[in-house]
Amino acid sequence: MSEKLKVGILGGTGMVGQRFISLLENHPWFEVTTIAASPRSAGKTYEEAVGDRWKMDTPMPEAVKKIVVMNVNEVEKVAAEVDFVFSAVDMTKEEIKKIEEEYAKTETPVVSNNSAHRWTPDVPMVVPEINPEHMEVIRYQRERLGTKRGFVAVKPNCSIQSYAPVLTAWKEFEPYEVVTTTYQAISGAGKTFKDWPEMVGNIIPYIGGEEEKSEKEPLRIWGHIDDEKKEIVPAASPVITCQCIRVPVLNGHTAAVFVKFKKKPTKEQLIEALRNYSGVPQELNLPSAPKQFIQYLEEDNRPQISLDVNFENGMGISVGRLREDTVYDWKFVGLSHNTVRGAAGGAVLCAELLKAQGYITKK
């Protein structure tokens, strides 16, 4: 492998930024050379800027401790140092939209963990195992931005990872109505129990904006590129209704899901479809790709966070409790790691796919 690509992390001091830095330690293709954050962190070493707010289980990588944090708003300066950036900035949606496009216009590809551009019509929102072909919309985005290399690509919300891959694996049976409730970990809010003591022994039945994302984002992932409109057009079905609940768990989003199918399958057909489902990342053997994307667990008391959340290093999806339902056809429970597959890990896999497809190259 030739020289590694130089990576910048925008918003490197927050929880998702820290997860990017942890995941990219010893990455075979990418090397974190630049970290940018808010003006108050700029000028300090990364170690100083984070201080006692390091939230990962593993220690801070030695290689990043002495990196001097740059001001994320000094776009030209940061862009000059890197081949591409991961974005985990904490700003308003409008500010994020603007700054990510500014980076793209410096001919620096942006792979974002933020929601700001998820509905920008020519921005691909990708789960690499599900819709890698959506990256082809980048050529239309580059036309609009007037760039040759620069673009923005995003990954979808963490909440949908526990059921959207499962429904994709069952596409041939035509699911048309889906009811789900997600039970979401506190790290999804960038918090630990130390930061958020009121979550201990508590449940909060509301997460702002999350239900709409959980209902609509899968349809965009299942959509197609309209070459006349130069954009991604979402799919019309299945209809999804969702409730999102914050639960006292550190990592891992669980979903209880009920599904109606146009062609009602057998249990064996459903399980076989899950176990056999894989995608382009597995074919290409991308560094962060799980060998097994979805596992089905036979035991009645699985999937469990404590046993299953780190399946395939947090990049795999665990499914269990598949059984016939009295109102719907089938029901199941899904589990995914919200800050690995659901956030930074999913974005790293997107970047690996973009490199393999030739969209991200050395400057």
Give, region by region, the residue ranges found by the protein language model.
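Charged docking surfaces used in two-component/phosphorelay signaling
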Residues: 187-363
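N-terminal Rossmann-like NAD(P) cofactor-binding subdomain of oxidoreductases
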Residues: 2-205, 239, 311, 317-318, ...
